[in-house]
Regions:
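Jelly-roll (double-stranded beta-helix
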Residues: 1-267
């Protein structure tokens, strides 16, 4: 299954491409949303993401290029720069902002929403800045991989999710091949942000491919090489109720989250 991203906007008008969380792919358990943001035009990102709430999941922001500033209601503050990751566990509730620290130049990256299991949706919120130099880089014949979470070729990523998952950023040279082990039963996908990938089908730039649930995933780069993220996770197989910035298990829990936010007791 190959899914194209759709152009939309979020925050205070940040233009982006939504891949998971779109009509074509509402979710891929445990992944709730995948956005790619990427532009040289400051008008597309300068308004940023002013303070807004979350409850019930984790956000993983991977910045390929650019500078953003994070602040949240727990007192955490961080700076996203080229190649860095921001890992935030919303848990029972957090209010945060993500605002650009640049007025010109390229901003590019991804935000992934990872669902929390039912028994962890109300854990205390947490935040972790992961600078680029703390993300392991693995060199292999024909390419490189950055390991954000999980294990790959002996390297372990610094991300610590509350459910089983891995997250790699991979660059493959022209027509080189790679086999990526995926645990049977996990949901996995790859998203191509440069070049073309072949995986029993052609996956072009700005497209996501849902991978098989059994065996290793074999990937071959096109003639110009390819850059892509590969992500896999253990499905939670639990009810999912969504309400804007909140993701819980029932509509009643969503209404409670809205009421808590309205009454100033979300955090």
């Amino acid at each position: 299954m190959v899914v194209p991203g759709i152009l939309t906007s979020d925050g205070a008008g940040v233009n982006l491409r939504r891949i998971i969380g779109s009509p074509q792919l509402n979710m891929l358990d445990p992944f709730l949303l995948l956005d790619e943001f990427g532009t040289n035009n400051p008008e597309d990102y300068i308004a940023g993401f002013p303070p807004h709430p979350h409850r019930g999941f984790e956000t993983i922001t991977y910045m390929l290029n650019g500078k953003f500033h994070h602040q949240d209601s727990t007192g955490n503050e961080g700076h996203l720069t080229d190649g860095s990751v921001q890992w935030m566990t919303a848990g029972r509730g957090v209010i945060h902002s993500e605002m650009p620290e640049q007025t010109e130049g390229l901003v590019r990256g991804f935000q992934l929403w990872l669902n929390l299991p039912k028994d962890k949706k109300m854990i205390p919120p947490a935040y972790k800045d992961i600078p680029a130099e703390n993300i392991p880089r693995v060199d292999f014949p024909g390419g490189t991989a950055k390991v954000i979470a999980g294990e790959f070729m002996g390297a372990t990523g610094p991300g610590q999710p509350h459910t089983g998952m891995f997250y790699y950023d991979i660059e493959l040279q022209s027509e080189k091949e790679l086999s990526i082990p995926v645990i049977d039963g996990w949901n996995a996908f790859l998203y191509v942000y440069e070049g073309i990938v072949l995986n029993n089908q052609t996956v072009e730039k700005d497209q996501l491919a849902v991978l098989g649930k059994t065996g290793d995933c074999r990937i071959k780069a096109g003639g110009l090489g390819a850059q892509f993220i590969v992500v896999a996770g253990e499905p939670l197989n639990e009810p999912v109720a969504r309400g804007g910035p909140f993701v819980m298990n029932t509509r009643e829990e969503i209404m409670q989250a809205f009421n808590d936010y309205k009454n100033g007791i979300l955090v």
